[in-house]
Amino acid sequence: MDEREALSRLASTLPGAGDDCAVVGDRVLTTDMLHGTTDFPAGVDRYTAGWRAVGASLSDVAAMGADAQAAVAAYGAPEFDPAEVHDFLRGAREVCDAVGAEYVGGDLDEHGEFTVATTALGRTDDPVRRGGAEPGDAVCVTGAFGRSAAALRAFERGDPGRGNELFRFTPRVAAGVALRPYATAMMDSSDGLARSLHQLVEASDAPDPGMSIEESAVPVADAVAELFDDPDERREAALFFGEDFELVFTVPDDAMEAARAASPTPVSVVGTVDRDGVRTDGEPLPDRGYGHGGAATDGR
């Protein structure tokens, strides 16, 4: 059983499950687990690991349109190098600082491989969930895609400095808050853009929902062109690799310009909500992306 199937089965037993965060009153709460073998390529330093691990949970808070308040992390490793632990905590604190949250503590434990579990807390009276996309809405994204794929390529080429730089990202908390009054549905792109589009369609309350996506409108990170020569690899990096932590959301067409003006992060319109599945340039868009328990996962 892969991650997707396991989560689907668990969600069926938990009322309200399926969004990027759990909602408890006016608070949103999320937790993530990352492992050395699946989430931190060779060359990732502990500063970047701390930044990225805590940032992943803060990105979930952003996807709900919530103000980020606090985060904690549990750090497991076969042994504790004081310098590595210090660098990890520095990364965790600084990514919190970047979004106006507070890093408030955590735990240390011996573990067979480097493993991190993070939890983040946010606050909003009106969270944006995944299920509100309606036909006619614009399909939008923040930022650009393929940065994490480019980071992996840099690590593979023996350039850890560039790889670590690309692997650190700023969670889109400010954009999420700004977009909250306009977005009908929203999530982050941790599983990849293609998979995120399918997830928004699956969650939609509209009858027989779908999306028509214009592939040329998808913003691609400059590092993708820098590190990938093959056009097919560039497409794979932007659409399917995942772990870019951008926001993927829908907005009524008549609110699009106001939403774009409100966001502190550039917003691109990549398509339209319609019916009959997810398509790009008229062809079905494969439902696959990043997943634990087997890297890229295929939806069937």
Task: Give each language-model segment a name.
Residues 46-70, 90-101, 172-174, 178, ...:
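Small-aliphatic-rich amphipathic alpha-helix that forms the alpha element of a beta-alpha
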Residues 260-300:
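Acidic, Ser/Thr/Pro-rich beta/coil linker or hinge segments at domain junctions
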Residues 88, 135, 256-268:
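Short amphipathic alpha-helices in soluble, non-transmembrane regions
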Residues 82-83, 127-128, 253-261:
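Short, conserved charged micro-motifs
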Residues 31, 129-177:
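Short, acidic (Asp/Glu-rich) active-site segment that either coordinates a divalent metal cofactor
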Residues 1-55, 59-62, 101, 285, ...:
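N-terminal glycine-rich phosphate/pyrophosphate-binding loops that anchor nucleotide-derived ligands
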Residues 80, 167-243, 274:
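Active-site-proximal betaalpha loop/short-helix elements
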Residues 69-151:
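Glycine-rich anion-binding loops of enzyme active sites
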